[in-house]
Amino acid sequence: ELIKSWEAGLDVRFLQNRLGLDFAWYKTNATRQLLNLPLDPFAGYSSRKVNAGNIQNEGLEISLNGAIFQSPDVQGFNWNATAQFSLNRNKIIDLYPGVTLYDIKTLDAIQIVAAQGSYYGDIYGQTFLRVTDKDSPHYGKVIVGDDGLPLISAEKSKVGNQSPDWMLGLTNSFSYKGFNLSFLVDFRIGGDIYSATASNLFVRGNAAGTVVNGERQDFVVPNTVVRKDGGYVENNVPVTHQNYWERIGSTGNYGLPEVFTYDATNIRLRNITLGYTFNRAMLKKTPFQRLNLSATCNNVWMIHYNLPGIDPESVSATNTNATGFENG
């Protein structure tokens, strides 16, 4: 593997070091990476290893820290804050001659891939069958069968990407008369994740979304059409909730990827730490020169998330780079 990298940075301080800004831009190209390419079964081997590919990482890292309030008294009230922002774009420039899609991880109907010309971690899976004629007034609508249930495409297509658009961490630290309190709020904005847990809940009828207005009445699948006389007409065939979710869950063991791929955006109170530092006078008759006692609580509060009651960080394939799949 060969790596070429470029980096530029800036470090500035203001107001007698009470305010600081660190800025870094980077760009790296990793080539000749070790890839496993599948072979014809008649070759006697399942795959071969080759050195190929060109993966480009480009991103920004910005850190802003400040002493919001400083007391002239050592034991007085102090408040310090830090904001750390980062974004990264991991683009697949090239893979291998004749190869445009490289499998990172396949889990039943879900496939995490590196697609040439796209970004690392694209999520591929089956989707609803839709009207593809752009000249049709029904373009983009879901096609259903005569039974009113959606038809499923046979081929996989892109339904999302596992990488976040950007991330931000906000840390605040307070101290007063030996006591210290700090907390961290994390922002993970963008990216997608497929939830097998949500699929199981919906398909079994245990999710709140399977009930409309407190009842499971028959309904017409919205924004759908049915084939008729060489064209399409609006669908008006009612279906039961059970039949609908059974159809959605009929794609592999984990259900239809298009339906159960969610925006992985989440904002959380990552941790809180409360501590107390004993002064030297209190430690005179002890063998300690300095003593601090603290208690920490992690994953305190999920402020915002899009998955139905599921932590988007509870990924399934933790031993690989395929983080776009959850099966809690």
Feature map (PLM): residue ranges:
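Outer-membrane beta-barrel transmembrane strand signature
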Residues: 1-13, 20, 107-185, 232-283
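Extracytoplasmic gating/loop element in the C-terminal half of outer-membrane beta-barrel translocons
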Residues: 190-292, 297-298, 310, 314
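Intrinsically disordered, low-complexity sequence elements enriched in Ser/Thr/Gly/Pro
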Residues: 30, 56, 87, 128, ...
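Conserved small-residue
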Residues: 50, 69-162, 193, 200-236, ...
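Extracellular/periplasmic, surface-exposed regions of secreted and cell-surface proteins
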Residues: 1-116, 256, 260-328
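Generic serine detector
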Residues: 5, 36, 46-47, 63, ...
